[in-house]
Amino acid sequence: MIGAGLAGSEAAWQLAEAGIDVVLHEMRPDRMTEAHRTATPAELVCSNSFRSDDAANNAVGLLHAEMRRLGSLIMRAADANQVPAGGALAVDRDSFAAAVATALQGHPRIELRRGEITGLPPAEWANVIIATGPLTSQPLADAIRALTDESALAFFDAIAPIVHKDTIDMSKAWFQSRYDKVGPGGTGADYINCPMTREQYDAFVAALLAGEKTDFKDWETNTPYFDGCLPIEVMAERGHETLRHGPMKPVGLTNPHDPTVKPYAIVQLRQDNKLGTLYNMVGFQTKLKYGPQQQIFRTIPGLENAEFARLGGLHRNTFLNSPKLLDQQLRLRAQPRLRFAGQMTGCEGYVESASIGLIAGLYAAAEARGASLAAPPPTTALGALLGHITGGHIETIDGATRSFQPMNINFGLFPPLAAAPTKKPDGTRLKGNEKTVAKKQAMSARALADLDRWIAEHLRVAAAA
């Protein structure tokens, strides 16, 4: 087990609890990262929040509940060290990390070994989990890249906002591919298009330039932008018309709502998951702060009431093109003895990273016993996130840059309900936002029921094997 962050600590715990001896390697304090300040396992380097703990109405709260049912060390330590934060689960970061460290060091099956792993693990290491996070040391990152290919690791996260499709106003927007081009897997109407007049475009560019931006972290400042990853506000700074000759170009598209008027600019959204519930804003990676992002992007015609599954961002990161490189059990296709977990697999957030460490640990434990473990159902938060990592992205329609990007858990990753709720328990019809609330609650209830069934049918059977 390489890396004692959230994912690595959780994976080691799951393995040990399953009766498997684990050597947990951590390079700190011998080699520190630009962000860590201690050598303690599971140090929280940014926020102290695990976000919403509402399992009935929030996808990350649901993930909390699922992890608790699976005996998560990270959730146990978080619950024991929480601080007041309204409906969120926030923790005292030092006592949280200390609790994780105490549990790991006190487990008879876990050996915590300090020192940097500077290359691929030796061949005799037959069952390895690599969970070294977004700040993986350069020697190990180079070794992984050499084993895969040059484009397998991204060193600058270009994140465009992702919108829930059912919140886009299709009386203003429309489906069409540029020049009606039919690409691989496409239909010729694969993008959602939002038109702008000249006045709307002028106001939009002015808002981008004036919007408050997030500063780079100290360790990010020397990382260059890559071609194709420029923040949208940086493009706007290069010239007033730059965007309408770039990601907002209006050519090859006709607005069926007003076919005689040529839009001055067009914002395109591209399907982001196989289910078709999420669409990303093409070319809209940004360093705008979250508040200004929502305010500015909701001025786009058709997105006035948009709900965002994820807001945009641009920060240094190290993550794998997991759908290409990893199999369904998080093993590297090129060398299946190596399994990956945590943020480097393409999940965002503390809880998400720990949850992928949890499932990686369960997979590795089953493998160590000569057994196999079925994946958790895609209707669960754990299964939905795993599905995104190992294959939930789609190939780009026009051969553009791959669409796989790190993602927080959200209900857009889940399969739709067979039938959405329409009535309250008292029989009266649901109205407006009540429908959204009822839908989320139904998805959460389905997830926990399916997880309990999976635990009974697969996990206990695997544990007994």
Swiss-Prot record:
Q: Give the family, as the similarity comment puts it.
A: Belongs to the MnmG family. TrmFO subfamily.
- Where in or outside the cell? Cytoplasm
- Known catalysed reaction(s)? uridine(54) in tRNA + (6R)-5,10-methylene-5,6,7,8-tetrahydrofolate + NADH + H(+) = 5-methyluridine(54) in tRNA + (6S)-5,6,7,8-tetrahydrofolate + NAD(+); uridine(54) in tRNA + (6R)-5,10-methylene-5,6,7,8-tetrahydrofolate + NADPH + H(+) = 5-methyluridine(54) in tRNA + (6S)-5,6,7,8-tetrahydrofolate + NADP(+)
Under which main EC class is this enzyme filed?
A: transferase
Which GO CC terms are listed, alphabetically?
cytosol
The answer to whether keyword Oxidoreductase applies is no
As for what it does, the entry says: Catalyzes the folate-dependent formation of 5-methyl-uridine at position 54 (M-5-U54) in all tRNAs.
Superkingdom is: Bacteria
Q: Which cofactor does it need?
A: FAD
In terms of NCBIfam families, this protein maps to: gid_trmFO (TIGR00137), PRK05335.1 (NF003739)
User: A Gene Ontology biological process annotation?
Assistant: tRNA methylation
Under the heading HAMAP family, the entry gives: TrmFO
- Which Pfam families does its entry note? GIDA
Q: Give the enzyme's EC designation.
A: 2.1.1.74
Q: Which residues bind FAD?
A: 3-8
Its name, as the record gives it, is: Methylenetetrahydrofolate--tRNA-(uracil-5-)-methyltransferase TrmFO
Among its keywords, does the record have Repressor?
no
Q: Indicate the principal place this protein occupies in or around the cell.
A: cytoplasm
